[in-house]
Structure formats: C-alpha cells, structure tokens
Amino acid sequence: MVQAKLRIKTTGIDHVVLWVKDLERSKRFYIDLLGMTIAHESEWQTFLWCGTQQIALFDATRRDHEIHAATELNHMALLMEPASYEEAKARIEEEGITTRGRQGDPTCLYFDDPDGHGLQLLYKGHDE
C-alpha cells in the first residue's frame, strides 16, 4: 500500500518582500499614496500593513545576504473599496504616475511603484 504524502496546509500570505532602491521614497509611496501603515521597521527594512497582510520593503543597497530570488515579480494586486476606485485613479495620476487598464475592463487599474514593481488595484467581487 502506497502511503499518501503529507500535504502542507497554508492558511494565507504573511508578507511579500520587495527590494527597493530608496527605502524612504518607497515608504512615502506606500504610506502616503496607498494608505498603508508601518507594522515594524529597522535600518534596512520596513514592514507595512496592507489589510491583514504585510508588504516588506527591503533596502536593495544592503542586498548582501543570500536569501533573494533570481526572478522578478509580475505584479501585486491590492484590494480596495469599490466606491473609491475613481478617486484612487485620479490621485495616482495626479502624482504623475502612468496608469494602465485592461481592455474591456474599466475597473482594473495597473501602475508601477517608484522601483518599477507592477501594482494592480481592484475590489472584492471583481474577477481577476
């Protein structure tokens, strides 16, 4: 009889790490523009609350340890309230940030952070 292998049961995402070129600039972007709050920080990293998950900004100039991926992030999708979509889009464009949509989907908003990481804003009930 073949014994079944243990299936690891994940329960959610704790945090996502983004390497950033300027930690202070990135903190201002995610806090001032996207409304995140600081969970905790050190000299070379800042963890931000995004709902119940965290986004960690790591200072790329201190990328001297070996734990880092060799691949790039495609994009990170952030949930928002449906009623604030148009206001959020206007605020992002007011900052001079180029936004992109998905053809045939006027409620899907893509843009880049200061380091070129792809971001998407969407709201619950919206199909990815």
Model-flagged regions — what are they?
Residues 2-5, 34, 62-65:
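A generic local structural motif
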Residues 22-37:
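Amphipathic alpha-helical segments
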Residues 1-7, 13-21, 49, 66-128, ...:
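Vicinal oxygen chelate
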Residues 37-70, 112, 118-125:
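Conserved short beta-strand elements that form part of the metal-binding/catalytic scaffold
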Residues 1-24, 75-76, 127-128:
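N-terminal beta-strand motif that seeds the catalytic metal site of vicinal oxygen chelate
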